[in-house]
């Protein structure tokens, strides 16, 4: 199947947002129960923390930390595990650190046009003495706009 979600039968997500002045933060706790399609996998748990600082009306700095845990229950994004590698797509733990800069071309309508530039470091583990897991850097550039 081409299912790209967590692979869990049931998922619970608790999110929290807060802001004060130029600073805002988002947090999300996740739990997925009953992983399907991966032998030996049961449950997956995760956390996302994303503080954002508005530098100016046009610029915003973003940091994001993500972690996920579960016995062979964490499914890595396909951009980390392309078909030409020998890294497993399912791991026991994953941590990612994202640092980005957003540029709003129309700050009075922030969803109109946004330029994004970021770097991300991902480290993952498989609790096995023979298996290696993905650890590496990604560089992102994007243009987002809304009609």
Would you name each region that the model predicts?
Residues 2-147:
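Outer-membrane beta-barrel pore domains
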């Amino acid at each position: 199947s081409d299912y790209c979600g967590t692979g869990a039968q049931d998922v619970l997500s608790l999110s929290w947002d807060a802001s004060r002045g130029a600073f805002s933060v988002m947090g999300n706790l996740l739990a997925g129960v009953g992983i399907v399609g991966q032998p030996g996998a049961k449950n997956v748990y995760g956390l996302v923390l994303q503080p954002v600082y508005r530098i100016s009306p046009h610029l915003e700095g973003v940091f994001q930390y993500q972690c996920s845990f579960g016995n062979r229950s964490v499914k890595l994004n396909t951009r980390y595990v392309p078909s030409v590698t020998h890294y497993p797509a399912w791991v026991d733990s994953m941590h990612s650190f994202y640092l980005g800069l957003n540029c709003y071309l129309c700050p009075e309508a922030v969803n109109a046009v946004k330029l994004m530039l970021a770097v991300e470091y991902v480290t993952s583990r498989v609790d096995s003495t023979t298996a290696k897991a993905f650890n590496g850097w990604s560089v992102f550039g994007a243009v987002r706009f809304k009609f």
